Amino acid sequence: MNRNRIYDIVQKGSVSILIFGTVGGTVLLGQSYYSHRQRRLAALQEFQQREKIKEEGFAEDEFNQLALK
């Protein structure tokens, strides 16, 4: 094997590793973003439900106070 052939193999291997790493990193980043987005949406829905329950409770308290007067 001459030196140029060795360099060619190393270069092709490096390029393959670089492409594989880039694609793999992109996939992992996409999965991470998607799971983060799902957690944020779930937290937002939970927050909205809590706020709705608070508002309903506040309206009930107000009604009860008016009924007592």
From Swiss-Prot:
Record Pfam families: COX14
Transmembrane segments: 13-35
BP term (GO), one: mitochondrial cytochrome c oxidase assembly
Main subcellular localisation: membrane
Keywords associated with the record: Membrane, Transmembrane, Transmembrane helix
InterPro entries recorded: COX14
Compartments in which it is found: Membrane
Membrane topology listed for this record: Single-pass membrane protein
Organism: Schizosaccharomyces pombe (strain 972 / ATCC 24843)
A GO CC annotation given for this chain: mitochondrial inner membrane
Protein name: Uncharacterized membrane protein C757.15
